[in-house]
Amino acid sequence: MRLSDQVSPAGPDPSHDMNLDATSDPMNLDDFIVPFDSPAEHSAHPSVDRNFAATPTGSIPIKSRKDHAMTDSSTAASFPHPPQDQRTNSEFGYVPRRVRKTSVDERQFFAGLSVPTRKRPAEASPQVPPVSNAMMAHSSELSAALPDYSLDHHLLLLLFLAMAQWAPPTSSPSHAFQHSLRLDTYGINEDHGLNSAGPYQQNFHFSPSDSPMTAGNPFSSLYAQTPLASSLNSTEFFSPPPSGYQSTVSTPQPIYEGEQSIFFSDAPSAESHTQRRIPNYIQQRQSNLSASLQPRYMYNMSNGESHPGSAVTGPPTTNMSGFSVPQHVNPSQVLGHGEFSTTAPASSMFTFGGDSDNEDDDGNFGERGGITMPNDFASLDESVDMSAGLHWDGGFPGSVQSLPGFSAQTRKHVTIGSTDMIDGPLEWNQGGTLGRAHGSAASVSEVRNQNQDPRRYGKVPRTASTPNAAALLRQSLNGSASGLPTNHPSPSTLPESGLSSRCLPARQPGGLKNGSTNAGPEPACTNCFTQTTPLWRRNPEGQPLCNACGLFLKLHGVVRPLSLKTDVIKKRNRSSANTLTVGTSRSSKKSSRKNSIQHAPSTSISSRMNTSESPPSINGSSTLGKPGVVPIAAAPPKSGPPAGVAQARAGVQVAPRRQRRLEKAPAGSEPDADDSPKSAAPPSRSKVVPLAPAMAPPAAANPANHSIAGGQGASQEWEWLTMSL
């Protein structure tokens, strides 16, 4: 048995197998998973496995190969063999190998087997040239001359030089700018706010904000300018657009220490004003869609660093503005020396340049985060005429109070057309314009709560546009101790009611000059061109309207047609306040309701004019008794009610708010004694009018009640605005 003699030295002993099984850990299966057999040994002894499988020894064939490999001293077990050859030449090479994940660290176990690592080695990486395959196919010399793809700087420089030689000259406007190599297209190093943050990395050989697919780079001739998903053969559309440069507004920058402050310096000067500039973003925006293909640079250029055929600009050196009319502000003229804090705040390490001015209205201006005031306000003085009929009163030259809104005690005198605005404390969000959209007279709630409600403080939407108001103002001025009106009153002369005691007399329509020297031309209605009206009103643009056109516009929302114009002014019956006839107007009913609670039998016309229609003044001026005075739509007096009214108010139970229909009372509402004629009213009046109780409850003095739409203040406001004649 020569075969058995060959097998016997290498064959395992049954007693040896029993000892091996007794000593091995039955749970440790890692030793039996990976074979250590080499393909060379396996091919040298092809009959070992077959004969050994036929022997009745009961051992496992894998163990026989393991023992056979250990007895052979020609090659070590840790000899590095390619795992592909090991699997293909082995007996079970067709079975995919599955490595079980156990608690044993297999990286150390497979260290001697040369198992491929997770990362691909550098020599096995594909060599990809930075050009398209279509260009490589059409130009064989280009593919042969191109070096291998690398990120080294010298190779990229050679590649760009080679591409610049092969690129054809372009003449289209979209290819107008070709960057030079190593061109600082941003000028970041010259920005004062970024010097201390470290130098900008200038090792880019192409613009970091420019995509290779755009038209302004050396790769412009290698790529199609039309996207694949587009059916338009045009270069006007491209998606996605090139990404913008990273933001420097929100980037935290360390504040200056030891050198000149970038904020307000101790002595305001032009040098300190230009130390910190607001970045001027690009102003010219082209109308076509090719603007999305342009590189988005932040700074405009004014220092002569432009290159021929280049749209890339450097940082500005002059004090340019971001708006259409750049105007410089000298801080020593506009801002006072003691108005604001002049030192930089040292409480924070970084300052952010993108802070909004609307978020810190209460703090000082110098405490905002390092941004100077936008230099778009001219030095406002008396000689500046901003528009034809709009004037700023710059009586405080060289002070901050010439700007619109730094002090609550300044006086702004705005002339719009032929009327004067009333004085009032000013804010940034109030430009002195009318508070209401229709621009008519003030409402009851706005006048009463002018100094009580902080939300309405400073909103005086009244115009002194009628001779009655002007005469009342002149009379109150003559009766006051201050004498002639001045342009800048003391803080004690702020308006306490609907009108101010320091308002200049307005231009008067009609022939009522009353000794005034600034009487202008007679106003005419901008809609129907009439000059005879009992009350002048205004449209939302501030143009004068007659009473009919103004009411029609306010009630219906459309312009009054000229077909409704009549030459005769119809006057309503004002003979008695307690008349309960069918043709009684709503105004007399309103006054009758007011007088019924006061238990007064009748009221004269002059007393009703005193209590409802004549605007009161501060110093107790009386109403003019001239027969030709034109009444205005004004507010009720701000003074308290009489003693009888105060006593009646304490005992009156306030009825809930109700709506009355003039031809029929609503079911479920008990009519009062003074509301009895509403069932006998003419049926033409069918509009539902919300009414308030005759005497307002004590809670009506709360400013919150007047700001609620549909409440008692709103109903009184509606009645006073529309039915004040």
Curated annotation (Swiss-Prot):
Family matches, as InterPro entries: Transcription_factor_GATA, Znf_GATA, Znf_NHR/GATA
Signal peptide (from-to): none
Main location, first listed in the record: nucleus
GO cellular component: nucleus
UniProt keyword list: Activator, DNA-binding, Metal-binding, Nitrate assimilation, Nucleus, Transcription, Transcription regulation, Zinc, Zinc-finger
Entry GO MF terms: DNA-binding transcription factor activity, RNA polymerase II-specific; RNA polymerase II cis-regulatory region sequence-specific DNA binding; zinc ion binding
GO biological process terms, semicolon-separated: negative regulation of transcription by RNA polymerase II; nitrate assimilation; positive regulation of transcription by RNA polymerase II
CDD domains: ZnF_GATA
Subcellular location: Nucleus
Chain spans, region Disordered: 1-90, 429-464, 479-524, 574-714
Ranges of compositional bias, category Polar residues: 442-452, 479-500, 575-584, 597-624
Biased composition (Basic and acidic residues): 39-48
Function: Major nitrogen regulatory protein.
Protein name (Swiss-Prot/TrEMBL): Nitrogen regulatory protein areA
Organism from which the protein derives: Penicillium chrysogenum
